[in-house]
């Protein structure tokens, strides 16, 4: 050992007192009998105590001081550096916690000792060191890193055979204030004497007899996990107190004894309380000082035992402490090995404690067992001792057998109870399974129902989609059909209008010729009518231009119609048409109140174009009752009045009035009046009458021919079918126009007729009711009675068709309060064909030009597009 430099006398004295003993100072146990084999050299001495150094890391501090410990490359020599020098200690191994965890430390130094215990050896592992050096942490570990206790149990029981032969018996003892307590058992009486420490009242105190604790309880098993959990739980019952040196300082020694009865092995794990200074620990009070004194007493007693054995003294003071009494077998048994783990701190503040710990370990390492030490088992020198040992083992085995039998009975009882509980649980499980089966069946049924419902839903959805597609297709076809029908109707109306224009031109030509003028000389009525429809603009706008282009006075002719009977037509017209000064010949022929007007459109100040439907004013045919004209020269040409031979003058006037109303040429009438005034003085009354009769006869012939073409008798129609005119009437005093003409079978009812009318109205359908038969202005027919009323019971119209009069329902009754107006009505009435209805005279005298086919095409008003300015 290198000399330590010293600057003071005190330092020399200190190092002299703690000098490590050398080999020459070791004392060997001499044999009482000489060696039988004296010729052979003695075997090398055996070291029963192995010392390992475990250096903990620094505490959790912000500033770490340099370490005072330094390990050589052989990992067996530790050098402690100080300001005045250094000192070396030789150990069997050194481990730093910063470099090696508990697992590496266990595999490197402890695992081989545990393997020896499994084959029957005895081993004692002691944790020695000052408080706060990490002894309990190395022994028991923590949650993340298990300690030596758990790893030892795992190695002993982990590789056991499948039969489960290997098991251990574990005893946990506590040495506190030089008293031994059993941590596995508790005292329920709780009548301990005064002065017992707090926390020890529930523990059982034991006595030492024959180097063992008498009546100590133990736990046995084959599972390392369960046993280690139990050990950790009872270890928490140790006396622990917080001091200035350690926040959780153990105030007692803990001894864990693991016996392996099958092989006779034993493992003793000793976690010693840390030696400490009373002043440094800050212990105050009698009890605290007694705890520290007793802890130091046990440590000092163990130190004396080690020194005595190392020095070879004849007397070893095992009885100085309860701890050394329990460890006596570990030091005296030849098969026992001691592993002493020295826990130290590298902190310079703990240098004095570190030196004391290393000196204690170096002293224990000097213990040797020489070759001359008698081996009682080997040579059989002491049979009595071996017999005692065998007897103790047999007794232990007997006790163990008895305990196993009692445990077996207890386990059988527990097994029976467990079987009963198992049967109950099985019954409950069976009931739950049956219930689960029922619910699964219900769930299956519900799933089947859901599947069926889904299938039905999909089927209905597909059918609905098909129906919707079919309805859409039918609607498109219906719209297309209506569009075509409207186009055909427009074309037909245009053709009829063209035909009427030609007829009117012919009438104009004939009229001019009859007056002695040429066709080319006059450009009045015919040219204006031709120019009216030759352009693309609507006719009504042209009529407005005609009225406002050349304003001339319009004369209203008022006259009286004679109600006296006459045998000839000429005498009748002679009395009716008396020429007056400054009056036109045509105005003389219209004594009724006639005023031809044009509907002017108001311009609205807006930003987009609108279509306004302008309806011509309905032509009201006003006739006065006339006596029948019995002329033999005229035939029955009127289809509505077969009794008269020739039309009256009033009927002819109304026919011409309708023609002029169609054209809307009010100014032309005044021009003709002016021209005829000039010719009134030249032509005689007889010549005027002849000319007038020639023109009216030709117009009458054309009208009769047209009426014969359009009016087809009922006999000429198809067998079994009827024609029905549908008329819309908002109120009794406000008659409207014909809607349409329907053809039905003879056995049809009003209900069938309603369906056809609703189909015709389409999306603009409006509630309506039929008026009672024969009473167009009377009460209404109930809807539920329509299926019982035949269509043949409707009144005849013009002798060849039936008339059905409709009236709006309750939702549209308020329209009856509105005055009759040619302005646009509701959407349904605007869609209807505009047909002027004439009031029928008592004699049913109707003009040929008022037939439905002609009037329907002449009275429709074209659309007029007004551009907003």
Curated annotation (Swiss-Prot):
Sorted keywords for this record are: ATP-binding, Coiled coil, Cytoplasm, Cytoskeleton, Microtubule, Motor protein, Nucleotide-binding
Disulfide-linked positions: none
Q: Which domain of life is it from?
A: Eukaryota
Q: Which GO terms describe its biological process?
A: plus-end directed microtubule sliding; vesicle transport along microtubule
**Predominant location of this chain?**
cytoplasm
Q: Which residues cross the membrane?
A: none
**Annotated ATP binding sites:** 129-136
Q: Which InterPro entries match?
A: Kinesin-like_fam, Kinesin_motor_dom, Kinesin_motor_dom_sf, P-loop_NTPase
| Region described as Disordered: spans on this chain | 1-50
Where does this polypeptide localize? Answer: Cytoplasm; Cytoplasm, Cytoskeleton, Phragmoplast
Molecular-function annotations in GO: ATP binding; microtubule binding; microtubule motor activity
Which residue stretches does the UniProt record annotate as biased composition, category Basic and acidic residues? 38-50
Q: What stretch or stretches form a coiled coil here?
A: 393-515
Q: Which SMART domains match?
A: KISc
Q: Name the Pfam families on file.
A: Kinesin
Compositional bias ranges of the Polar residues kind = 1-36
GO CC annotation: cytoplasm; microtubule; phragmoplast
Kinesin motor domain residues are: 48-367
Q: How does it assemble?
A: Binds microtubules.
Its biological purpose is as follows: Probable plus end-directed motor protein that may contribute to the transport of Golgi-derived vesicles in the phragmoplast.
Name the family.
Belongs to the TRAFAC class myosin-kinesin ATPase superfamily. Kinesin family. KIN-10 subfamily.
Q: What is this protein called?
A: Kinesin-like protein KIN-10A
**Where does this protein come from, organism-wise?**
Arabidopsis thaliana
């Amino acid at each position: 050992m290198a000399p330590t430099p010293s600057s003071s006398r005190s330092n020399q004295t200190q190092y002299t007192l703690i000098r490590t003993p050398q080999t020459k100072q070791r004392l060997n146990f001499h044999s009482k009998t000489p060696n039988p084999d004296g010729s052979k050299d003695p075997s090398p001495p055996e070291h029963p105590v192995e010392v390992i150094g475990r250096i903990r890391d620094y505490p959790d501090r912000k500033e770490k001081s340099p370490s005072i410990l330094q390990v050589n490359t052989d990992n067996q020599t530790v050098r402690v550096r100080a300001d005045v020098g250094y000192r070396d200690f030789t150990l069997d191994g050194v481990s730093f916690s910063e470099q090696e965890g508990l697992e590496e430390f266990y595999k490197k130094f402890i695992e081989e000792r545990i393997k020896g215990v499994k084959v029957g050896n005895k081993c004692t592992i002691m944790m020695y060191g000052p408080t706060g050096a990490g002894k309990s942490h190395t022994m028991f570990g923590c949650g993340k890193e298990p300690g030596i206790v758990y790893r030892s149990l795992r190695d002993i029981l982990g590789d056991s055979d499948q039969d489960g032969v290997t098991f251990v018996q574990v005893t946990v003892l506590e040495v506190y204030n030089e008293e031994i307590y059993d941590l596995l058992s508790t005292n329920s009486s709780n009548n301990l004497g005064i002065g017992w420490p707090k926390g020890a009242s529930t523990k059982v105190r034991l006595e030492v007899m024959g180097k063992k604790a008498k009546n100590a309880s133990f736990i046995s098993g084959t599972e390392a996990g369960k046993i280690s959990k139990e050990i950790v739980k009872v270890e928490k019952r140790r006396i622990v107190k917080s001091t200035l040196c350690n926040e959780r300082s153990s105030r007692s020694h803990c001894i864990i004894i693991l016996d392996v009865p099958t092989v006779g092995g034993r493992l003793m794990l000793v976690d010693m309380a840390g030696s400490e200074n009373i002043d440094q620990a800050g212990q105050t009070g009698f009890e605290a000082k007694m705890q520290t004194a007793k802890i130091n007493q046990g440590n000092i007693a163990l130190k004396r035992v080690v020194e005595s054995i190392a020095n070879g003294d004849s007397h070893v003071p095992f009885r100085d402490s309860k701890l050394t009494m329990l460890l006596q077998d570990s030091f005296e048994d030849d098969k026992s090995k001691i592993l002493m783990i020295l826990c130290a701190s590298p902190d310079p503040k703990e240098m004095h404690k570190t030196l004391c710990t290393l000196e204690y370990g170096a002293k224990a390492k000097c213990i040797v067992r020489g070759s001359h030490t008698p081996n009682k088992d080997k040579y059989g020198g002491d049979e009595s001792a071996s017999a005692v040992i065998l007897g103790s083992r047999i007794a232990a085995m007997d006790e163990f057998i008895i305990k196993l039998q009692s445990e077996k009975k207890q386990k059988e009882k527990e097994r029976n109870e467990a079987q009963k509980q198992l049967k109950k649980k099985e019954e409950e499980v069976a009931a739950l399974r049956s219930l689960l089966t029922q619910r699964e069946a219900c769930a299956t049924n519900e799933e089947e129902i859901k599947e069926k419902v889904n299938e039905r839903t999909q089927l209905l959805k597909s059918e609905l989609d098909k129906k919707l597609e079919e309805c859409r297709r039918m609607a498109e076809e219906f719209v297309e059909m209506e569009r075509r029908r409207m186009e055909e109707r427009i074309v037909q109306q245009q053709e009829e209008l063209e035909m009427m224009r030609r007829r009117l031109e012919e009438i104009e030509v004939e009229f001019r010729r009859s007056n002695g003028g040429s066709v080319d000389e006059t450009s009045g009525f015919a040219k204006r009518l031709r120019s009216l429809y030759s352009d693309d603009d609507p006719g009504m706008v042209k009529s407005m231009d005609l009225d406002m282009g050349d304003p001339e006075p319009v004369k209203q002719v008022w006259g009286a119609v004679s109600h006296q009977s006459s045998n000839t037509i000429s005498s009748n017209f002679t009395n009716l048409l008396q020429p007056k000064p400054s009056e036109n010949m045509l105005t003389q022929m219209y004594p009724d109140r006639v005023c031809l007007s044009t509907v002017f459109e108001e311009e609205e100040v807006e930003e987009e174009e609108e279509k306004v439907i302008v309806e011509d004013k309905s032509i009201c045919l006003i006739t006065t009752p006339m006596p029948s004209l019995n002329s033999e020269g005229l035939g029955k040409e009127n289809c509505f009045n077969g009794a008269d031979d020739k039309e009256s003058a009033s009927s002819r006037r109304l026919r011409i009035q309708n023609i002029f109303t169609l054209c809307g040429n009010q100014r032309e009438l005044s021009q003709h009046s002016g021209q005829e005034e000039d010719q009134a003085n030249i032509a005689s009354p007889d010549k005027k009458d002849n000319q007038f009769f020639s023109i009216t006869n030709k117009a009458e012939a054309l009208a009769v021919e047209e009426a014969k073409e359009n009016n087809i008798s009922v006999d000429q129609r198809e067998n079994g079918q009827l024609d029905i005119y549908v008329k819309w009437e908002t109120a009794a005093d406000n008659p409207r126009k014909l809607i349409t003409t329907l053809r039905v079978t003879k056995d049809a009812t009003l209900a069938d007729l309603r369906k056809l009318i609703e189909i015709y109205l389409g999306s603009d359908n409006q509630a309506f009711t039929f008026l009672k038969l024969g009473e167009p202005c009377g009460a209404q027919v109930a809807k539920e009675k329509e299926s019982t009323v035949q269509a043949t019971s409707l009144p005849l119209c013009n002798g060849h068709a039936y008339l059905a009069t409709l009236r709006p329902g309750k939702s549209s009754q308020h329209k009856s309060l509105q005055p009759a107006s040619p302005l646009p009505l509701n959407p349904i009435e605007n869609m209807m064909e505009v047909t002027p209805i004439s009031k029928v005279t008592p004699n049913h005298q109707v003009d040929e030009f008022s037939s439905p086919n002609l009037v329907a095409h002449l009275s429709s008003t074209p659309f007029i597009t007004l551009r907003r300015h």
